[in-house]
Amino acid sequence: EAYSFIYKAFHKGYQTWSRYMSFAEWWNFENLRSEDYLEEEFNGKKLMSIAEQAYIAYSKKLLEGEMSDPFRQQRVVDKEKIELFLPKLDTIIEDHPKYQYPPYFKAKLLLAIGSEENVLSAFLPFARQKANNFWVWELMAEIFSEDPEIQFACYCKGLSLNTPEEYLVNLRLKFAGILRGRSMYNEAKTEINNIIATKNNKGWDLGIKISNWMEQDWYKNAEEYSNNQDLYLEHTIKAENILYNDLPEEIVAVEFVDRNRKTINFVENQHKYGKFKYSNFLKNP
């Protein structure tokens, strides 16, 4: 118990503590007690177990990397440390499937060491759970960096979700660059102006890239749309299909078609039934 108390005390400042990784390695996660793997409760709210917090914090520090030059300007990830840590992360994912975030960080770590072939299978179970979060699709776009069409669809899916605008600035910025590269200048200007409005509202600096784009002829001559929702909807189904590509196909019976709500009720057996929106799949079912 005292050992766990020591870890909790030092864990609180891990984000700004440059020696956190050394401390965690000295402390050794194998010293976590069985109680440390259980959720805690504070003021009526459930809290992530200290074990899950520990693995996430260490993953974040691995992804941050370590200073590689005397001027402390560049960071590099330690691939050897990541490779040593991944089996431990696999164990906690397997032993504690209810932990939501370790699969996400496993995918990030695999990307960091260039192990793309294993990333998708590691990430999909988490992505299916968190599919309504924009950052899931931002990472999915990173996973499919070698497939421009799927990457494009992932950005569309991420931006189609109901999310506070201040969280979407970086995603919109990446997407605007892709749109510009495809000569989709009207759509790119729409994304850029959305970013500008958000940054102005928050009192944030526009940044060099936005400022440079605003001075270029393509931006000045482009037409701004009210939004890019039609573009998003045109491509989201391609992104959504990724989530289920590794699952076996099943045959079901259609019970009812609600043309007003554009939903289909289906049933396979007395234990498996449900409904889904068909507008992205079918025009006239």
Per-segment meaning from a language model:
Residues 223-261, 285:
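Structural detector for short beta-strands of small beta-barrel domains
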Residues 27-28, 156-161, 180-204:
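TPR/TPR-like (Sel1-like) alpha-helical repeat modules
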Residues 265-284:
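Beta-strand/loop nucleic-acid-binding surfaces
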